[in-house]
Amino acid sequence: MVQLELKKDQIMKNKIIEALMYFQGDQGLSPEQVKEVFDLEKDQEGKKLLNDFMEFYNAREGGTKVFVFGEIYKIATIEPLKDYVSKLVSIVRYQKLSKAAIEVAGIVAYKQPITKSMINEIRGVASDQVVNTLLVKNLIEEVGISPTPGKPVLYGITNKFYDYFKIKSLQELPNLSEFDFVQSIDEEQEEEQSYEGFNLFSSQREN
């Protein structure tokens, strides 16, 4: 019975770490962050949980594995699949932006330099995939590293951002407070929503 309880406890910890790692995206997860989440006393305890999770996760025959970069643990695509990922990148580059991507682009424009966790906090939902899409389309870029714990990447907009949305300055964008940070709005609402005469959703260039 005790062994069963211990197994359930480890399974739950693995689930939590997987969720945290997914939320962090390419920023990864550090032993210090795990220590804080689980209310542990030492970073070494957080590192052990991460190593246990990595052993569990990498034992499966999946398309992703946990890799360690210094002290940061990340879930990433395995090497044999990189060509398929590259094909998807080329497809995404020529697709128009979703409402979620437009929202994130607006947040980066107004709050730059900004970390992914700050974007998540503003929107109230994880934005990792959206940020990756904007990076692929070269609308945002990495502009530095934050000195905060975990040293997350800072993002800012690129010159292509202005061309993509047909604007000359950020003053032409709607106020940040007027964005609706809910990803589940219907397509009809996306097309109808405009701000002070400027419709950010219809301002995209045909790419």
From Swiss-Prot:
GO annotations under biological process?
A: cell division; chromosome separation; DNA replication
Q: Which UniProt keywords apply?
A: Cell cycle, Cell division, Chromosome partition, Cytoplasm
Q: Which GO terms describe its cellular component?
A: cytoplasm
Compartments it resides in: Cytoplasm
> What InterPro entries does the database record attribute to this sequence?
ScpB_csome_segregation, WH-like_DNA-bd_sf, WH_DNA-bd_sf
Q: What is its main location?
A: cytoplasm
Pfam families annotated for this entry?
Answer: SMC_ScpB (PF04079)
The family database entries (NCBIfam families) matched by this protein are listed as: SMC-Scp complex subunit ScpB
Family statement = Belongs to the ScpB family.
Write down the HAMAP family for this protein, in alphabetical order: ScpB (MF_01804)
| Subunit composition and interactions | Homodimer. Homodimerization may be required to stabilize the binding of ScpA to the Smc head domains. Component of a cohesin-like complex composed of ScpA, ScpB and the Smc homodimer, in which ScpA and ScpB bind to the head domain of Smc. The presence of the three proteins is required for the association of the complex with DNA.
> What job does the chain carry out?
Participates in chromosomal partition during cell division. May act via the formation of a condensin-like complex containing Smc and ScpA that pull DNA away from mid-cell into both cell halves.
Which protein are we looking at?
Segregation and condensation protein B
Gene coding for it: scpB
